[in-house]
Amino acid sequence: MKSYTKKMLSLTSSLLIAAQQCFVAMPAGAVDTPSEAENYAQSIGLELNSSAAEDALSDLIDINDEGLAVAVDDNNNVTQIDGLLSNETVDSSNDAKDIIAKTSELLGIDNVNREIRLDDVSESDYNKVYTFKQFYQGLEMVNSYITVVVDKETGEAEFLNSSYVSDFSINTTPAISVQQANNVVNEKFNNISIIGYDLVIYSENDNDFKLAWRIKTDAIGVTEVYVDAVTSEILKDIVVDEALSPVYNNRIYSNSLLLNYSDKILPDNVYSFDVDVSKEGSLYYLRDIGRNLYVCVDPSYSRAKSSWAPYESHILKSYNNQFNSSEVEQLGVAVLYNVKRVYDFFNSNFGHKGFDGKNSKFYLVPNVKSTTNGRESNAWSAGNALWFGEGNGATEQSFASDIDVIGHEFGHSVTGSKVQWGGSNGQTGALNEAYADIFGEYCDNTREWQIGTDIYKKNTGKNTTNKKTTCIRDLTIRKNHNKSTNYVSIGNHEGSKVISHTAYWMDKLGIEANTAVKIWFTSLDYLPKGGNKATFDDCRKAVVRATQKVVQNKAQSEYVVKVKTAFNRVHVYDNNEIIGDLCHDGKLDSFDLVILKQAVMGTKSLTPAERAQADLNFDGKVNSADVTLLQNYVLGKITDF
């Protein structure tokens, strides 16, 4: 992942800083006064390389008054524009492309028509998001996107994310043929059927670009494989949705003999329930046609996930519509039931049908084995497929038994479709896991803020709202951003606790569940797409932005303060809102201590945002306890709050 620091200031504060920096004695007759755009560019560390770039920035300043914020990386690339992008509404993808054209000089794009092509148009409750891909000499650059976010109600383009790569060059002549690449794929994936290919430029970070063959297969779970077109190394295998033939004949299936209480796989003591199956000829198929959910099983009942890919022919079937004669049939029914619940959660809360919002076919594998043909203790998302291990059988039951585990894996498929984070490491990888945990917790609807409690048999039958001693991940345990800087080495799951603990604090601060989950889902509209792009700072900004979108009443400012307080709790700060920094100078010292003491004594009033910064122990109060904490910090007695 490219190491860089994003620099972002509001228009008002940046121009004030620039004015202070630029106020120097001028010789008599000098008239070369910096323009407003030049002042703003200087304040955020942006070098304007042309008059056209200056004009583009000037136009943005003119139409935004005080609402503009621009982010720039260390390579002088504009990565984000938060503010009104045009005075004209956006009603089509062509309009969105025109927005990019108007800012192309800032983004470093030489030829918009040649280098940028529409990839996707998606909608949430509040926004319409136009996603464009970058091309180089006619070849797609994988993981390089520009997104334009448009308010659905007003039609205003109000946000832009860019991972466009400028000043780029690579040899586009492959050293191996596509047939050689096909052979590599066939050797690894046991002769799966190949249905297409193209030549692309592949990158997982902004410093390592490779010419690659993208091989498309018709397998479920491995539908795109990237093969280095020079070395023949497999760079990545990835899943995208492919259209499959429709299935008809829907009927209701009810099974009261699923599992006994001692080996409970479903919550709330539910043992009789409905799932949808379909019938063709004399066979019944475990597939929910309306939701496009298909239960597939390994026909050998013994293979590990890494050694086979399911096809539609692997759908679980029965002659008598009694899917209860074996463990795998019972697991299949339970998986379909629980995934149906998660599907309905995303649909009812966000209008998001299926993993991709388009109700595309989704495959569920309930009987994955370990690499040693033993019982697998894990679960995976593979884009258009979910895979569940059966658990070790002694202390664990199926990993499909816990609704938040299914919500987690389903969430991976959703974020994979919306922001393409799959396979990322570092902070993006941590975000990928955090969002999955957050969605899983809200699907569970218990607010215990623990993932995977129900897979453990010792927790069976216990009150689901009480905290358990055994779980996969405990989101109530605080992890501070400033305590770990290398998020690659500590791993995605451990790093994810920074952001998932933020969600826990949003809940503790009183943001109700139906509002909070909409905030998190809507925040995906504002986050950078592609592998290894998004950071924790991006997440804070996106969640604050989403809060302003979701909460449209008088309580908006109160909710924004709560969200910022939750991020402060894990030390993911705004530049101007560091906890305890009441002087707003980016550091904690005796000057902040003086202001805090005055506030506690009642001789100085604080705004709601300042009160959130002054509440160092996060107890909802500003009192002597906060003074003691800050004093000990200033004296060097403690290093954290």
Which residue stretches match the model-derived regions?
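Cellulosome-associated attachment modules in secreted, modular CAZymes
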Residues: 8, 19, 23-30, 575-641
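Sec-dependent signal peptide hydrophobic core
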Residues: 5-16
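Zymogen propeptides/activation segments of proteases
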Residues: 2-7, 22-406, 413-576
